[in-house]
Amino acid sequence: MNLDNQSKYLIGQIISDKRDKTVTVRIDRKVKHPLYGKIITRSKKYHAHDEHNQYKVGDVVAISEARPISKTKSWRVIKVVKIN
């Protein structure tokens, strides 16, 4: 898939693939501390839909917004960026 056509996508690393058709993706971002100015890494975890259970822990993937698939899952994996 072409990432240019996606409305919103994020790139992150898969940290869990234990559930059926679901992966947990950690998205890291860099922020500057408001007082001290140090660059800090903040992260957030998203559950994403993996239809064919083809992605493994350590893979870097792009995820895109989708309709709600379950209570906590409203993202889907659109392509692998780097295979571990």
From Swiss-Prot:
GO terms for molecular function: rRNA binding; structural constituent of ribosome. The keyword Transmembrane helix does not apply. Belongs to the universal ribosomal protein uS17 family. One of its GO terms (biological process) is translation. Part of the 30S ribosomal subunit. It comes from Nitrosomonas eutropha (strain DSM 101675 / C91 / Nm57). PROSITE patterns: RIBOSOMAL_S17. One of the primary rRNA binding proteins, it binds specifically to the 5'-end of 16S ribosomal RNA. GO terms for cellular component: cytosolic small ribosomal subunit. It comes from the Bacteria. This is Small ribosomal subunit protein uS17. Keywords: Ribonucleoprotein, Ribosomal protein, RNA-binding, rRNA-binding.
